[in-house]
A protein has these predicted regions:
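Chalcogenol-based redox active-site neighborhoods
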Residues: 1-143
Length: 143
């Protein structure tokens, strides 16, 4: 069961695709779209990532940050980002600590769930049913 609207988003620090540290607190004051997905370079996950890529400018115009999280490692994320020219940050969670903190552990992978976190670190929206082809636009409509 995913975390609820109104809950303070769990803080985390992990590595991005380049091995650099990334923390939720790095984006204080901004809307963060924290999207969890099962696996790099698989059909549904690729469509979802491409949707965020194609809408990236619209997210920037709304001062929103996109963070994609899966249990893949940094190298896998780096290859996925390069292959599909993804302009946003992918967060590696191989130890599943973030996945578990956000209650989206699918038993070895992250469930496809998205949290919209406001600038004060509170969850404003939760998407537990995701249509990978339209998900990025569905979220934008509510920002």
């Amino acid at each position: 069961m995913a975390l609820s609207v109104g809950t303070t988003a769990p803080r985390f620090t992990a590595q991005d695709s380049e091995g650099n540290p990334v923390s939720l607190s790095d984006f204080a004051g901004k809307t963060v779209v924290l999207y969890f997905y099962p696996k790099d370079d698989t059909p549904g996950c690729t469509r979802e990532a491409q949707g965020f890529r194609d809408s990236y400018t619209e997210y920037q115009n709304k001062d929103a940050v996109i963070l994609g999280v899966s249990t893949d490692d940094c190298t896998s994320h780096q290859l996925f980002k390069q292959k599909y020219e993804l302009p946003f940050t992918l967060v590696a969670d191989p130890d599943k600590s973030i996945t578990k903190a956000y209650d989206v552990d699918g038993g070895g992978y992250a469930k496809r769930v998205t949290y919209v976190i406001n600038g004060t670190g509170v969850i404003d929206q939760v998407f537990t049913t995701v249509k990978t082809d339209t998900h990025a636009q569905d979220i934008l409509a509510g920002l």
